[in-house]
Amino acid sequence: MSTGISTDLHVHFGALNFSKTYKSGLSNRTVSFSRVGYAQNRKLSCSVSNTENVAPKDDERGKDRPLVKMCGITSARDAAMAVEAGADFIGMIIWPHSKRSISLSVAKDISKVAREGGAKPVGVFVEDDDNTILRAADSSDLELVQLHGNGSRAAFSRLVRKRRVIYVLNANQDGKLLNEVPEEDCHLADWILVDSATGGSGHGFNWAQFKLPSVRSRNGWLLAGGINPTNVSEALSILQPDGIDVSSGICGTDGIQKDKSKISSFITAVRSVHY
């Protein structure tokens, strides 16, 4: 996938006529492109991540498709449905102001179901400090923590050295990013997730106008925001993210519990897309 997020070597493409970059695909294949020229009077920026103590790759399951994160899971039952359908990540809202918020004890039960099914449990945090997030992650047996809001994002540089992190970027309706990743630590994040300005609302943004920023993470990037079974194929085809995140798009009529038929339809639509 030709995006600005890679896992090994990153070059600001404006400085080159062509570039050399190594990119791990979802099928565990490595694609390389060779540099053929350098544009004069432009700066070249290159950074290579330290290969020591690298967190495990989330694409090692070798599936030739985008990875799937099902978020806003509120019960072990819904987690089991999601895992059985093929979800790679099970997301839980650890934020009291969300209608899909759950307690740490329920989160621990969900984490157990996720891990037993081969999925990774993710805790979603909004405006919490690093100590609060670390305590909750330990208590709930989370694999990754997802950082929303300026408060939680401010703790990124401290958290990323202790926990696997999904760093959230928000885009407005026109597809313009409203925040950025700290450049000095962005390569330490496991994933970059691009969401709408109001995550979990079911509202998306203009995919056609969105431009992926030149940032990198260990695994790549996830797309969220207004995704559902009827539009996920279009979203994947336009932006070709490494993974897709769905929450309200697979909910039942109460907007909280997950709907089995919607989960099935969503997975079927995702599996119909191959990059």
From Swiss-Prot:
Induction: By silver nitrate and UV irradiation.
GO molecular function per UniProt: phosphoribosylanthranilate isomerase activity
Involved pathway(s): Amino-acid biosynthesis; L-tryptophan biosynthesis; L-tryptophan from chorismate: step 3/5
Interval spanned by the transit peptide: 1-32
Annotated EC: 5.3.1.24
Database matches in SUPFAM superfamilies: Ribulose-phoshate binding barrel
Places the protein is found: Plastid, Chloroplast
Keyword Isomerase annotated: yes
UniProtKB keywords: Amino-acid biosynthesis, Aromatic amino acid biosynthesis, Chloroplast, Isomerase, Plastid, Transit peptide, Tryptophan biosynthesis
Cellular component terms per the entry's GO annotation: chloroplast
GO biological process assignments: L-tryptophan biosynthetic process
Tissue spec. comment: Expressed in roots and shoots.
Catalytic activity, reaction form: N-(5-phospho-beta-D-ribosyl)anthranilate = 1-(2-carboxyphenylamino)-1-deoxy-D-ribulose 5-phosphate
Superkingdom field: Eukaryota
Matches recorded under InterPro entries: Aldolase_TIM, PRAI_dom, RibuloseP-bd_barrel, TrpF_fam
Family the UniProt entry places it in: Belongs to the TrpF family.
HAMAP family in the record: PRAI (MF_00135)
The protein's name: N-(5'-phosphoribosyl)anthranilate isomerase 2, chloroplastic
